[in-house]
């Protein structure tokens, strides 16, 4: 029987971002809206769509060998699964998300201790209970099935909700008074899968390529030609990931320079390179950067 890795893809808010990340990493996943078993162009992987909230449970039970989910849901589950790698991406951005304690803007609540005896609505029930317990604050934590932002002040006094930008909370006239936890996506695996040499190698391959795709998102490649007489001036401008690659051109007076830099600084660096003597400057996108 051929080796096969059973991989959980998060259904819901992370689904599109995850499929797009796999595409940049070299795998095409095709998700039919009616099927929970997406196809993938790798005969060694079998995909299944699972909600991020349940991923740790199915990995722990051995239904899946590995899966992608937020570390928040792993902590919430309390299950003993392993993290293969951290992958910092979310629905809208390439940064961690926060679970925050939020209250109505019009309220006098300024800190967790002000909520003694109050009702807190959240999806992250156990984590929320632990948070208030560590502060010695007695509250009633209620599970929220969604639309949590609209519950204060009529259905709850405060909420613990996940946010990337805070814009949804502001739109619902809520203010953040504390951060309960930060979270980011992890590739998790069962202990049994990690003990299998082939599955471990396959998971390491996936982790390497996914990390490479994430690292490449904020980077661009840059190549240019420069006269040897101006090379030191050009190199002084470049904030390289590693030392730039310098190649001799057919004209002995000229060399080619290749490097990688953050996309956000390219707009400032390119004019300075030109002023320092760079010519034929080309910026190009990167699919993967494997460090």
Language model: regions and residue ranges:
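Small-molecule-sensing regulatory modules
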Residues: 2-44, 49, 69-98, 106-291
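Short, structured active-site "lid" loops
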Residues: 44-65
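Signature of uroporphyrinogen-III synthase
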Residues: 57, 98-102
